[in-house]
Amino acid sequence: MSTFGHYFRVTTYGESHCKSVGCIVDGVPPGMELTEDDIQPQMTRRRPGQSAITTPRDEKDRVIIQSGTEFGVTLGTPIGMLVMNEDQRPKDYGNKTMDIYPRPSHADWTYLEKYGVKASSGGGRSSARETIGRVAAGAIAEKYLKLAYGVEIVAFVSSVGSEHLFPPTAEHPSPSTNPEFLKLVNSITRETVDSFLPVRCPDAEANKRMEDLITKFRDNHDSIGGTVTCVIRNVPSGLGEPAFDKLEAMLAHAMLSIPATKGFEVGSGFGGCEVPGSIHNDPFVSAENTEIPPSVAASGAARNGIPRPKLTTKTNFSGGIQGGISNGAPIYFRVGFKPAATIGQEQTTATYDGTSEGVLAAKGRHDPSVVPRAVPIVEAMAALVIMDAVLAQQARHTAKSLLPPLKQTINSGKDTVGNGVSENVQESDLAQ
């Protein structure tokens, strides 16, 4: 379907070469200041034509808010946003071979099988142009999360092809065992990431190696994949649902819905499978003396006296999630992107009707590697997941706070989303 989320619902629309793309966002809290200026920076980070190693398609991707705000303030009603497709070239796809042959590893064939008809230009609905609506909606979610809780979301390119920022070694099979990676998790900012354009890998040497590799594949009319790592800091504890809607499951759902994704791992991930439990377990320690980040100190939660979690963990192999529920530590995960399917090299493939084979040389304008522009898309989907989980937790505890206190419990104040909570105690304790 084209809708994501339960409480913060985002519906995207549009195809690669239609007149516009965009979204409708339902569930935005009323009373938040919001203009296009809050959304445009992320749109600009996502847009094509950023450098010599991205698609040359010339789109400004200027977002227009159509509804849901008045005088720059959210009304609590659905917010509609659109971006015009200004540099459409459907004629690039109307040549004889691309009408006859489905592109290898693209969605041409599968969309035709599903719908019985498909867009003849670009990837249609499967195009990365669809993610414009996601990024616009994610910017709204992110603003609320930062104002309310001081949440910070930062993604960066962690590998391109065989070039890694933190290559696996015998000592560090997972980056989560590497002190340098954990230092990066706690300190990386978007400003730092964007100072390493065009690749967005926050290390000068690795960034150069990755750029050279992408350039090599571009010059050969080929493509190469890679990974994007994302960090979410200052997340309230208690987010996520048991069983089927665990927080990491919802993050995986969100990330694997992004075009060209092929893999997802959270925390220590697959490398953590090689680490013994005696090392992998994250011991709890008191968070009493933990330094409060400036964004948290300035948040609505701090102003309203909502306490920070009482505990934190000494290590963070779990990636900030245990039992499917956030524990307050930084959440980090990695998303794998395949090489872009559309390449300029000639490829032998079958016709749509399967009666013969021929040679397809795809036309159009495409990224030799999608990972540099995937960074803000990953951030946006992360924001949508956390926003939805926050609203679910707020709804649950608001409903609970209106009930009379249970006789066998003692109220211990407020939880990390700002509602009264109770601690279970023995009846003998109540008599003392």
UniProtKB/Swiss-Prot annotation:
In the UniProt record, does the keyword Heme occur?
A: no
Q: Which GO terms describe its molecular function?
A: chorismate synthase activity; FMN binding; FMN reductase (NADPH) activity; riboflavin reductase (NADPH) activity
> What pathway is this protein a component of?
Metabolic intermediate biosynthesis; chorismate biosynthesis; chorismate from D-erythrose 4-phosphate and phosphoenolpyruvate: step 7/7
Cited Pfam families: Chorismate_synt (PF01264)
Task: Report the GO terms under cellular component.
Answer: cytosol
Q: What residue stretch is flagged as signal peptide?
A: none
Catalytic residue positions: H17, H106, D367
Q: How does activity depend on pH?
A: Optimum pH is 7.0-8.0.
Its domain of life reads Eukaryota
The biological processes this protein is annotated with in GO are: amino acid biosynthetic process; aromatic amino acid family biosynthetic process; chorismate biosynthetic process
What is the reaction catalyzed? Answer: 5-O-(1-carboxyvinyl)-3-phosphoshikimate = chorismate + phosphate; FMNH2 + NADP(+) = FMN + NADPH + 2 H(+)
| EC number(s) stated in the UniProt entry for this protein | 1.5.1.38, 4.2.3.5
Ranges for region Disordered: 406-432
Compositional bias segments (type: Polar residues):
408-432
Print the keywords alphabetically: Amino-acid biosynthesis, Aromatic amino acid biosynthesis, Flavoprotein, FMN, Lyase, Multifunctional enzyme, NADP, Oxidoreductase, Stress response
Entry-linked Gene3D superfamilies: Chorismate synthase AroC
Domain commentary: NADPH binds in or near the substrate (5-enolpyruvylshikimate 3-phosphate) binding site, suggesting that NADPH binding to bifunctional chorismate synthases is embedded in the general protein structure and a special NADPH binding domain is not required to generate the intrinsic oxidoreductase activity.
The family assignment reads: Belongs to the chorismate synthase family.
Cite the record's note on assembly. Answer: Homotetramer.
Function of the molecule: Bifunctional chorismate synthase and flavin reductase that catalyzes the conversion of 5-enolpyruvylshikimate 3-phosphate (EPSP) to form chorismate, which is the last common intermediate in the synthesis of the three aromatic amino acids phenylalanine, tyrosine and tryptophan. Acts also as a flavin reductase (FR) able to generate reduced flavin mononucleotide in the presence of NADPH.
Protein name as annotated: Chorismate synthase aro-2
